[in-house]
């Protein structure tokens, strides 16, 4: 099974397993580390936050299904955890949910802030999302508008 198919099927299984528990997939990594592949799953709960027991339950059920379906093309290690305090932002609903939070965005290409300075990294308060563009009040006092299709990576930043 191709890598994209593995990711798609694991995503489907997590949705099936997580839904009754109120658990959603935040991010999924499937990549080579050393000689083995790693399936790294990051989960969250909309209500009350995810805990170790939740992660263990999803891990157990996911592992059982992966064993039964036996579609993984090679040996792998399964890791299931919360996304942590620097949670990635992947979907529009993530940006909507974390409005007003400090974020860091890295783009595929250089983009201008409101002063015309070009950069690939934007750090500041998320102020909005509309029409596929996120607004950020930068820590330097400027404002930036970043199209979602230009975002390579985005995540929450820890605020001291």
Curated annotation (Swiss-Prot):
Database matches in HAMAP family: RimP
Keywords, alphabetical: Cytoplasm, Ribosome biogenesis
Domain of life: Bacteria
A Pfam family this chain is assigned to: DUF150_C
One GO cellular component term: cytosol
InterPro entries linked: Ribosome_maturation_RimP, RimP_C, RimP_C_sf, RimP_N, RimP_N_sf
Family assignment from sequence similarity: Belongs to the RimP family.
CDD domains linked: YlxS_C
Function: Required for maturation of 30S ribosomal subunits.
Name listed for the protein in its UniProt record: Ribosome maturation factor RimP
Annotated source species: Geobacter sp. (strain M21)
UniProt-listed GO biological process terms: ribosomal small subunit assembly; translation
Cell compartments where the protein resides: Cytoplasm
SUPFAM superfamilies: YhbC-like, C-terminal domain, YhbC-like, N-terminal domain
Cytoplasm recorded as keyword: yes
């Amino acid at each position: 099974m191709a890598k994209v198919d593995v990711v798609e099927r694991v995503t489907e299984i997590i949705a099936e397993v997580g839904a009754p528990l109120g658990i959603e997939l935040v991010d999924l990594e499937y990549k080579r580390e050393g000689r083995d592949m790693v399936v790294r799953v990051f989960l969250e709960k909309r209500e009350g936050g995810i805990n170790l027991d939740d992660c263990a339950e999803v891990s157990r059920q996911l592992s059982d299904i992966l064993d039964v379906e036996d579609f993984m093309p090679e040996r792998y290690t399964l890791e299931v955890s919360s996304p942590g305090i620097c949670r990635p932002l992947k979907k529009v609903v993530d940006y909507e949910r974390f409005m007003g939070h400090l974020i860091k965005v890295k783009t595929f290409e250089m983009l201008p802030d409101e002063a015309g300075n070009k950069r690939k990294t934007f750090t500041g308060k998320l102020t909005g999302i509309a029409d596929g563009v996120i607004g950020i009040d930068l820590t330097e006092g400027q404002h930036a508008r970043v199209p979602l299709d230009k975002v390579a990576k985005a995540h929450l930043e820890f605020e001291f």
